[in-house]
Amino acid sequence: MTIEKKLEDLGLVLPDLKPPLGAYVPYLERDGLVFISGQGPVLAGGGAICGRLGDGLDIEDGARAAQLSALNILAQIRAAVGSDWQKLVRIVRLCGYVNATPDFTHHPAVVNGAS
């Protein structure tokens, strides 16, 4: 079963890639590794989830933002491997950043949205 089929079974779909908004490459392949540039919670129809957790955004908003970011990462991987998911052996590192107020303490629940 392909990654895209597994996502479809979960009601998820990889987004179409948009051109970068700046002077950077979305991914770089080097010595069998693919490095993905930072990906954010960009919505399929345009725009993005913006704001701070604990100040207008709740845990569910944050988890959805993490999920969207993860889908964007997978879309970049798909582009890097030419849709041949067999080339993907493992994801070595995933780093999540959470914009939150100082009193917000549920960072793991937010980043878990990328799982």
Task: Please state what every model-predicted region is.
Residues 1-115:
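Short, polar/acidic, helix-capping and beta-turn segments at strand->helix junctions
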